[in-house]
Curated annotation (Swiss-Prot):
This is Palmitoyltransferase pfa3. It comes from Neurospora crassa (strain ATCC 24698 / 74-OR23-1A / CBS 708.71 / DSM 1257 / FGSC 987). The chain crosses the membrane at residues 39-59, 77-97, 176-196, 218-238. Residues 466-488 have a biased composition (Low complexity). Its EC number is 2.3.1.225. The keyword Acyltransferase applies. It is an enzyme of class 2 (transferase). Residues 60-76, 197-217 are vacuolar.
Length: 622
């Protein structure tokens, strides 16, 4: 009875020991410190942008109030710099703290829907041909939407994840982001022009500022604003070009998977880095920094979360026959290392061929959502021209339904027709892939012995089922077996191209025992040529038939004459005269094909066996 309280007290003492409490508190403080560090790293770009722009505005204002030999550096210069600074920071703040738009409701069930759900268009699908669905968000992804692993949500019309904004650039903040790039680029060039002009004039005139080490802020502003202006202007110009074409950064860079193996190599590198035992293992902090940059453009620099990764070892086509073959053959399943040489060559050849077709098609297809420069810019900036310079969301559309490019639809239909015509030509040539929907059943005649033709089923009436072949063919094939040609062994080229070696157009297929194509020699005018060998062979056959018919007629005439003379008993061995044997000429009543009369000496040597055989022919005769 005393053991239980003692055990409880000892357990509580062990749990409340100073060492366990200190360890628990240490882990809690470590997790808090880690969260604070991550928050600081996340919002450090914001602090950097605000501080840099504020410092540049301060230097510009001080430069405009300082006496200088540059005449245009006055109060107007300071006013322009301050206006650009305010507009740039306004756009930056709006782009950072405005949601880019998501496919899911951020408020859950706290609010009831006030409008009908939008109708989503689906011009783009996954690599396997299915509708785009995000497994992370458990929601359907419309066109131009992608899942961001950093923001942990699907973003409508996602352009990219900007680390300098600590958020994604999407449908609702794309306009503010583009205005921020424009205002910041102009602000950098204005600051560079003012600070560089002031520094140049002071150095060339050799004024007192050179002797007293002129203000360092002016020199730093000229260098920093020049460098940032060059880089940011190029970036801004590229985004303006994409906006005029109606493209996003992801849509522009996604074409690299057709034009070069860049996308495949990046995905393979990402898989190796995140798979134990493959690739070069990076330190944890190094891998986190690398993931930050790879998360910028999901689907291009890394596999997009929420979607199945494309298989690297199997062809990326949407053929159902390949999927069924991989299910039935474990050697062809993804991740298996049991590949034969022929299978690997076949897979690589198909992959190269499909990549080549995709590359050719990508060069022919225009952008699916390019409606022209005016309409693309109106979609981004809105119809109200007074609100274009300000970071107010005036973008047209809800991000779910998109109007396609008519040229893209026309090109897509044309390429689809060309692909179908190519497949038809390949099938007609005999080496193209077979179409499961267009397979026509071919009747192969087989011979069945008469004693094995039993009706199926039990007792009762059984009716003859109608046959699909003509009556003449049924009669001709009912008593003679059909000839089945031997199948050829597929060659290496046949296995690579996926064709059947027994389906060539220049072969002679046998159907119902006859060739479906008459193989004869033709003249240039299209007439049939007569070959001398064929004529000679035909003459020999005719002579043979003639002699056989003549001998048969003579034999029939002699038989009729003997029947008249012997009163129909020329083949009987009755009596002692042995007339039947004399007439027959050989034992057993076998006739000679040349002459029915043989020497009499052979007739008197008959045996009992011959008599029995002859006696069997005398049934029913008195």
């Amino acid at each position: 009875m005393d053991a239980t309280p003692y055990t409880t007290s000892s357990t509580s003492t062990a749990l409340d020991s100073p060492s366990s409490l200190s360890a628990t508190m240490a882990r809690r403080w470590a997790r808090k410190l880690e969260r604070y560090c991550c928050t600081c790293v996340t919002y450090f770009p914001l602090a950097f942008v605000y501080s840099m722009t504020s410092w540049a505005a301060y230097v510009d204002v001080s430069l405009s109030t300082t006496p200088s030999r540059v005449t245009w550096l006055g109060h107007s210069y300071g006013f322009i710099a301050v206006v650009l600074y305010l507009l740039a920071n306004w756009c930056y703040t709006y782009a950072v703290f405005t949601s880019p738009g998501s496919t899911t409701n951020e408020y859950g069930y706290s609010t009831l829907p006030t409008q009908a759900p939008p109708t989503a268009t689906s011009f783009t699908v996954k690599s396997n041909g299915e509708f785009r669905f995000c497994k992370k968000c458990q929601a359907r992804k419309p066109d131009r939407a992608h899942h961001c692993s950093t923001c942990r949500r699907c973003v409508l019309k996602m352009d990219h994840h900007c680390p300098w904004l600590a958020t994604c650039v999407g449908l609702r903040n794309h306009k503010a982001f583009l205005l921020f790039l424009i205002y910041t680029s102009v602000f950098c060039w204005v600051s560079f022009a003012g600070s560089a002009s002031w520094v140049w004039e002071e150095i060339m005139s050799n004024t007192t500022y050179v002797e007293t080490l002129m203000p360092v802020n002016y020199i730093m502003l000229s260098v920093i604003s020049g460098i940032i202006g060059i880089v940011l202007s190029a970036f801004c110009g590229w985004h303006i070009y994409l906006a005029s074409r109606g493209q996003t950064t992801i849509e522009c860079l996604e074409k690299t998977r057709y034009l070069s193996p860049l996308r495949e190599s990046m995905q393979r590198t990402y898989v190796n880095q995140h798979t134990p035992g493959q690739g070069i293992a990076l330190p944890k902090y190094g891998q986190q920094l690398l993931d930050i940059h790879q998360n910028t453009i999901p689907g291009v620099t890394r596999p997009e979360e929420g979607e199945e990764m494309r298989r690297m070892t199997t062809p990326s086509g949407s053929s159902q026959r390949n999927d069924l073959a991989s299910q039935h053959n474990p050697e062809l399943q993804a991740g298996s290392r049991r590949f034969t040489y022929d299978e690997m060559e076949h897979i690589r050849a198909r992959k190269r061929y499909e990549d080549y077709l995709d590359e050719q098609d990508s060069t022919k297809l225009p952008h699916a959502f390019d409606l022209g420069t005016p309409r693309n810019l109106l979609h981004l900036f809105g119809t109200n021209a007074w609100l274009w310079p300000f970071p107010v969301c005036t973008t047209i559309g809800d991000g779910w339904s998109w109007e396609p490019n008519p040229k893209w639809i026309e090109a897509r239909d044309r390429i689809a027709r060309e692909r179908e015509e190519q497949r038809q030509r390949e099938r007609q040539a005999g080496w193209g892939p077979a179409d499961d929907d267009d397979i026509t059943p071919v009747y192969t005649p087989t011979w069945t012995p008469p004693n094995q033709q039993h009706p199926q089923g039990g007792a009762g009436r059984h009716y003859l089922q109608p046959s699909s072949q003509p009556q003449t063919q049924r009669n001709s094939n009912s008593s003679s077996p059909s000839f089945t040609p031997s199948r050829r062994t597929p060659s290496k080229a046949d296995r690579i191209l996926g064709r059947d070696p027994n389906m060539y157009a220049d072969d002679e297929p046998v159907i119902y025992g006859k060739h479906d194509v008459a193989m004869s020699r033709l003249s240039p005018a299209g007439r049939t040529l007569v070959v001398e060998d064929d004529v000679l062979n035909d003459d020999d056959d005719d002579d043979e038939d003639y002699f056989q018919d003549a001998g048969r007629k003579q034999e029939d005439a002699e038989q009729s004459a003997l029947n008249v003379v012997t009163n129909g008993r020329w083949g009987r061995p009755a009596g002692a005269s042995g007339v039947g044997l004399l007439a027959h000429g050989r034992p057993g009543g076998a006739r000679s094909p040349i002459s029915p009369i043989s020497p009499p000496a052979r007739g008197f040597g008959g045996s009992a066996k011959n008599g029995e055989e002859g006696r069997s022919n005398d049934d029913g005769v008195d």
